[in-house]
Amino acid sequence: MQLAEHATDHVLTPAEVRVLRMIAEGNANKEIAAQLSVSEDTVKGQVGNILSKLGANDRTHAARIGLKRGIIEI
């Protein structure tokens, strides 16, 4: 089980890891988009990918998974 759990850690792209870190810091999609100079739709797509790849129910759950697995630090 642990191997399968950690196998997903490397599935996130560098851009998705950056967005996940910003989510964990409390940023909304609009704020993330402005800081990264991308569209809000791009961020929404990345958030959707993050949730799917991590098996998270929502943004907060994704941040908790990311922190627990060591994908991100804040």
Regions found by a protein language model. Name each.
Residues 35-37, 71-74:
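Hydrophobic transmembrane alpha-helix bundles
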